[in-house]
From Swiss-Prot:
GO terms for biological process: tRNA methylation; tRNA wobble uridine modification. One of its GO terms (molecular function) is GTPase activity. It comes from Pseudomonas putida (strain ATCC 47054 / DSM 6125 / CFBP 8728 / NCIMB 11950 / KT2440). The keyword Magnesium applies. Binds 1 potassium ion per subunit. The keyword Signal does not apply. The lineage of its organism: Bacteria, Pseudomonadati, Pseudomonadota, Gammaproteobacteria, Pseudomonadales. This is tRNA modification GTPase MnmE. Exhibits a very high intrinsic GTPase hydrolysis rate. Involved in the addition of a carboxymethylaminomethyl (cmnm) group at the wobble position (U34) of certain tRNAs, forming tRNA-cmnm(5)s(2)U34.
């Protein structure tokens, strides 16, 4: 039997007790199930209040039945919703009644999967449903809603259309050599290619912000021993997460703390103090710290503002320069302002990094500057009309598309190889297609939808 033609059923509301609970059905038996359970033929898109009965006519519950005939439904199939009381026992009895009339229990995400397979939404929109449900902040929810409404997909579709136009031009020139089109002399190909690369870069940047809002930003606190790193972690966490002493090298290993700032998730990593040491255990801690720095979304480089070397903090640890991300991802924290007498402030430096002067010992003003700065790094200041949600797999696909475009451009400019450019353009289009599901393996679809809630 084709499983897509089976009628599926699941409880669509959250587990636990509540005022209302919903059982959702999708498939060819939806109308028949409505008749058998309610005792009446349901008018499409009308609310029918009445009893829900078992196979012997006994009342299981009372509530509202709604029938949506396909293709004008969420899944594109006939859909029935039974809205009753939100007790788990009542809902389970109602679900078992649906199984009695011929339904099977739905797999996690199967309703959204059917909507995707029936072209009611694309893969990015389907994933946005889960992102909206799991959103941990109002900004993340707004971004997920915009993706659900198709904003991310429209951006990807626009890039795909531009790639198709470029492929047509390039492949036509290859297939009809008598036209003698010189790709480089013509200039049209490079112009179109650079325009696509520019727009792709913009989408990558916005998708990166969307992924941070969804998954949380990894913030690594780094610096010399006794710079106040652990004190800063404790202030951000709002509790004594790390041991703080005056003994240099107290923190010898990675310490992770998951926190929220106004609902926005951050994964804060405290690290061992960066210094040369003969202590084997501490040396391992320093190596782990440098590794964490290289993997961070944001690095907080903490310096003791009372130390003589604080005037040139990036010279404190030469290996830090090799491990740190883009300078724009480094925030310099000049700590212990209460001792140095420096003014609490935030400054934007010429090389792209931000400097915040504060005291990690109860300086509310400086700590609020840091919190606001971290929210800004995650895209908190986006307007309701900008941004969209994205996942790591989307970022990987965008990166692959960008790499193919870069490689294709190099093949064209260095070797004049139009055939190789055409292949890179095809690969870039394929990578973008994986975002919306235009090109997706069954294994990928299975992994994505299996992570959804049952009933979604």
């Amino acid at each position: 039997m084709n499983t897509v033609r089976e009628t599926i059923a699941a409880i669509a509301t959250a587990q636990g007790r509540g005022g209302v609970g919903i059982v959702r059905l999708s498939g060819p038996l939806a109308a028949k199930a409505g008749l058998l359970i309610t005792g009446r033929t349901l008018t499409p898109r009308h609310a029918h209040y009445g009893p829900f009965r078992d196979d012997e006519g006994l009342v299981l519950d009372e509530g509202i039945a709604l029938f949506f005939p396909g293709p004008n439904s969420f899944t594109g199939e006939d859909v029935l919703e039974l809205q009753g009381h939100g007790g788990p026992v009542v809902l389970d009895m109602l679900l078992q009644r649906c199984v009695q009339v011929g339904c099977r229990l739905a797999r996690p995400g199967e309703f959204s999967e059917r909507a995707f397979l029936n072209d009611k939404l694309d893969l990015a929109q389907a994933e946005a449903i889960a992102d909206l449900i799991e959103a941990s902040s109002s900004q993340a929810a707004r971004n997920a809603l915009r993706s659900l409404q198709g904003e991310f997909s429209r951006r990807v579709h626009s890039l795909t259309e531009a790639l198709i136009a470029l492929r047509i031009y390039v492949e036509a020139a290859i297939d009809f050599p008598e036209e003698e089109i010189d790709f480089l002399a013509d200039g049209h190909v490079l112009s179109m290619l650079d325009a696509v690369r520019s727009e792709l870069s913009t989408v990558q940047r916005e998708a990166g912000q969307g992924a941070l809002l969804r998954d949380g930003m990894t913030v690594v606190i780094a610096g010399r021993p006794n710079a106040g790193k652990s004190s800063l972690l404790n202030q951000l966490a709002g509790r004594e997460a790390a041991i703080v002493t005056d003994i240099a090298g107290t923190t010898r290993d990675i310490l992770r703390e998951h926190i929220h700032i106004d609902g926005m998730p951050l994964h804060v990593v405290d690290t061992a103090g960066l210094r040369d040491t003969d202590d084997h255990v501490e040396k391992i801690g320093v190596e782990r710290a440098l590794k964490a720095i290289g993997e961070a979304d944001r690095v907080l480089l903490v310096v003791d503002s009372t130390a003589p070397e604080a005037s040139d903090p990036f010279a404190l640890w030469p290996e830090f320069l090799a491990q740190r991300p883009d300078p724009a991802k480094v925030t310099l924290i000049r700590n212990k302002a209460d001792l140095s007498g420096e003014r609490v402030a935030l400054e934007q430096c010429d090389d792209g990094h931000v400097t915040i002067t504060l005291s990690a010992k109860g300086d509310d003003t400086g700590l609020q500057l840091l919190r606001d700065h971290l929210k800004g790094c995650m895209g908190y200041e986006q307007t309701a009309e900008s941004g969209f949600s994205a996942r790591r797999r989307h970022l990987d696909a965008l990166r692959q598309a960008s790499e193919h475009l870069e490689h294709g451009r190099a093949q064209l400019t260095l070797a004049g190889a139009g055939e190789l450019l055409a292949e890179d353009l095809r690969q870039a289009q394929h990578a973008l297609g994986e975002i919306t599901g235009a090109f997706s393996s069954d294994d990928l679809l299975g992994r994505i939808f299996s992570s959804f809630c049952i009933g979604k």
